[in-house]
C-alpha cells in the first residue's frame, strides 16, 4: 500500500461521490464516471472526504493483509483519478513526424496518411474527444484517464517512431533514442 492511501481524497466543490454495493459513482461539471470495486476495502465518505480503509472481514489469515493493502492503494488512485477527471479532465497530445504524414478528422473518424499505400482510418470512441489542430498534431481528451491513454496508445500504434529515422507518431515531449545506421 502506498502511504498516500492512508490520506483521504478531498471532494472539490461541485463534485458528488456516491458509494453503494461496491460501486463508486463520481459526478462533476465535466461528466460522470462509475467504477466497480472488489470488497477488499471499505470506501466511506466523511466530511467531504473519501476514505479508503481495509475491510477486516476479508482478512482470514495474516498473508491476506498484503492483498488488502495492495487494493487499498490501487483504489485510492482510481478514485482520485475519477475526481480529477470530472473536474479538470485529461489530455494527451500526439505529434506526427515524417514527410507526407498527416491526420485529419472526417466526422467521427480520424484519417491518417502514414506512409502506407492506403490511408489509416480510426473510428473515434464516443467517450473520448479527438481534435486535429494542425495536420501533424492530434489531441485526445476526455474525463476517463484510462480511456484517454488507451485511445492515444491505439493511435500511436499505427506508426510508432522508427528507431533509425525518428519518423512516426509520438507523444509530445517523448524522446525517441535513435540508433546509428549501418557503417559502410
Swiss-Prot record:
| Any single Gene Ontology cellular-component annotation | cytosolic large ribosomal subunit
Record note on quaternary structure? Part of the 50S ribosomal subunit.
GO molecular function list: rRNA binding; structural constituent of ribosome
Going by the UniProt record, its keywords in alphabetical order are: Ribonucleoprotein, Ribosomal protein, RNA-binding, rRNA-binding
Q: Which positions, given as ranges, span the membrane?
A: none
Q: Which InterPro entries match?
A: Ribosomal_uL6-like, Ribosomal_uL6-like_a/b-dom_sf, Ribosomal_uL6_a/b-dom, Ribosomal_uL6_bac-type
Q: Which family does it belong to?
A: Belongs to the universal ribosomal protein uL6 family.
Q: Which GO terms describe its biological process?
A: cytoplasmic translation
Annotated organism of origin: Thermotoga neapolitana (strain ATCC 49049 / DSM 4359 / NBRC 107923 / NS-E)
Q: Which domain of life is it from?
A: Bacteria
Q: What functional role does this protein have?
A: This protein binds to the 23S rRNA, and is important in its secondary structure. It is located near the subunit interface in the base of the L7/L12 stalk, and near the tRNA binding site of the peptidyltransferase center.
User: How is this protein named in the record?
Assistant: Large ribosomal subunit protein uL6
Amino acid at each position: 500500500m502506498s502511504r498516500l492511501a492512508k490520506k483521504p481524497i478531498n471532494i472539490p466543490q461541485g463534485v458528488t461521490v456516491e458509494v453503494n454495493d461496491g460501486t463508486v459513482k463520481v459526478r462533476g461539471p465535466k461528466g460522470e464516471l462509475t467504477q466497480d470495486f472488489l470488497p477488499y476495502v471499505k470506501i466511506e465518505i466523511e466530511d467531504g472526504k473519501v476514505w479508503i480503509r481495509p475491510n477486516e472481514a476479508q482478512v482470514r489469515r495474516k498473508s491476506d493483509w498484503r492483498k488488502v493493502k495492495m487494493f487499498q492503494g490501487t483504489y485510492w488512485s482510481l478514485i482520485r483519478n475519477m475526481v480529477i477527471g470530472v473536474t479538470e479532465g485529461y489530455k494527451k497530445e500526439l505529434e506526427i513526424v515524417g514527410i507526407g504524414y498527416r491526420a485529419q478528422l472526417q466526422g467521427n473518424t480520424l484519417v491518417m496518411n502514414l506512409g502506407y499505400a492506403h490511408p489509416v482510418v480510426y473510428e473515434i470512441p464516443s467517450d473520448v474527444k479527438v481534435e486535429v489542430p494542425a495536420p501533424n498534431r492530434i489531441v485526445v481528451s476526455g474525463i476517463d484517464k484510462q480511456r484517454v491513454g488507451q485511445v492515444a496508445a491505439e493511435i500511436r500504434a499505427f506508426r510508432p517512431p522508427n528507431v533509425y529515422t525518428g519518423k512516426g507518431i509520438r507523444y509530445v515531449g517523448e524522446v525517441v533514442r535513435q540508433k546509428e545506421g549501418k557503417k559502410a
